[in-house]
Amino acid sequence: MNSHASNGRSRNWPHALLESALLTSALLMASSVALANAPAVPEAPKALVKELHQAKTYTITSPPTGPLEMAKPVLPDLSGYTTEAALKKIARNKPGKITVARMMEETGLKEFIGGDNKMAEWVVRQKGIPQAIMISDGYVNLQDLVKKVPKQFLSEVSPGVYVARLPILVKETGIFEIDSKTKELRLSQEKGSFIVSEGKMLITNTSVNAWSETRNGLAAYRTPDEFRPFVLTWGGSQTWIAKTKMASMGYNQSKSYGVSISQYTPNTAKVLKRGEPTGWIIDSEFADMWYGFYCYETRDFVVKGNTYRDNIVYGIDPHDRSHGLIIAENDVYGTKKKHGIIISREVDNSFIFRNKSHNNKLSGVVLDRNSVGNIVAYNEIYQNHTDGITLYESGNNLLWGNRVIANRRHGIRVRNSVNIKLYENVAMANGLMGVYGHIKDLNDTDRDIELDPFDAQVSLIMVGGELSSNGSGPLSIDSPLSVELYRVSMLMPTKEVGISLNGILGERQDEILDLLVRQKKAVLIDPVESQTELRE
């Protein structure tokens, strides 16, 4: 574990953006602090929101600063996650068994052929009873497969380039390797090829792509529901992908998103009782995927040093009850529909650090649906089309040392989340607020409240860092349970009115800034009445 976290990655900020932001900051610092009489109001969605009770009276005090001081977070050591280390993860001494067998007899393939007339899809694609290539009872590499599988199902079309025209299943006892001897493995879109692993799979120094034989090119995204080949690993599996390029995989179908690491479906998991899947994806590139990365009930997975570019829905999307994840040093950009990086629904005790997430359709980084105990540190989040970092209904998280710059809406947005610690973050040149905290009643929305409960409460501690040149102001927090501020550098927004604190902070702005800026003390803002008391 690293006791001293550093942020030594190069920052390829657009030159004009940095020049403008730094010049503006210098001018603002020279201007000193000016207090505004007319605070700006940030935009906030109003549809489907119940009117919540607003506390009318807050106390402003200056607590001791000692409890607010915190050591830098200890981040995982990444030095062991290398291609060389991955190559040592599997045993190659026992040759495995290769067969071509019916899909419907295999637990690992039931998701794709059972119910809803799914079988018919594969009958049409294969023009017969659906079959798959099976690997079991030992080690097999792609060249072994080519030697034993009929050429109509798997063939070499040019030196080192192979086309698979059936699904490939790595069974629980199987070990499958694709390495540098393979220049490219093409999974046929028309024939319905894909890869599923219940065992061990190692993919290094190669390319694996979804391929349209009809168009003689990548199976480029056209519509959400058009089948595109994918890679999926199930419960108990171990997967390592390193120095590999993957493109044009996945579509809008369960477990078929692109590269997915998932526990079995609940009913199957109860029967098989296999552990959570795990593994690494490192130093690789993913483009035009439905999801660049997805996981479900996965443990200790490492996503490090990858490029996720121009993917469709999400770049990186760990989901339901995954934990102990490391998402580090990735470059995520150009996501077309939603967020660059999102963890959602009880994704806990994980690390998101030293990533770049930029130019995504919505937010750069999102913590969502009761994801707690996470550390988000030293990330560079810029030029996203909504917020930089967004926390939805996810308390007890630490954001440390992030640079959140030139996002179109808020720099950091915190909704219905308590005990959020914001330490040493820079939010600069964002379209609305530098930091925006608010509550929202979700009962009248399409949210499943039993599955994803929430409390309409927000509280945060903000220590150090800088909020400067944000379009609507440095900071706005509506109806908080509490707010603590200390050593926060707040420079003027782009508007000429000077510093303007919004929400309840604006009502006591003079007192807050006197303590925080002039006296350099900590500030604690507490409501006299709690939400419970107000409702009663």
Curated annotation (Swiss-Prot):
Principal location class: periplasm
GO biological process: alginic acid biosynthetic process
Catalytic residues (UniProt): H319
GO cellular component terms given for this protein: periplasmic space
Broad class of enzyme this protein falls into: isomerase
Enzyme nomenclature, EC number: 5.1.3.37
InterPro entries: Beta_helix, Carb-bd_sugar_hydrolysis-dom, Mannuronan_C5-epimerase, Para_beta_helix_rpt-2, PbH1, Pectin_lyas_fold, Pectin_lyase_fold/virulence
A GO MF label: isomerase activity
Reactions mediated catalytically: [(1->4)-beta-D-mannuronosyl](n) = [alginate](n)
Pfam families, per the entry: Beta_helix
Signal sequence extent: 1-36
Pathway as given in its UniProt record: Glycan biosynthesis; alginate biosynthesis
Effect seen on changing Y392 to F/A: Retains 65% of epimerase activity
Effect of Y296A: Retains 66% of epimerase activity
PbH1 repeat segments: 298-320, 322-345, 347-369, 371-393, 394-416
Record's subcellular location: Periplasm
Resulting phenotype, S344A: Retains 54% of epimerase activity
Keywords recorded for this protein, A-Z: Alginate biosynthesis, Isomerase, Periplasm, Repeat, Signal
General function of this protein: Catalyzes the epimerization of beta-D-mannuronate to alpha-L-guluronate during the synthesis of the linear polysaccharide alginate. In addition, is part of a periplasmic protein complex that protects alginate from degradation by AlgL by channeling the newly formed alginate polymer through a scaffold that transfers the alginate polymer through the periplasmic space to the outer membrane secretin AlgE.
NCBIfam families in UniProt: epimerase_AlgG, para_beta_helix
Domain text: The C-terminal region contains a right-handed beta-helix (RHbetaH) fold, which is common among proteins that bind and cleave long-chain linear polysaccharides.
Protein name (record): Mannuronan C5-epimerase
Organism: Pseudomonas syringae pv. tomato (strain ATCC BAA-871 / DC3000)
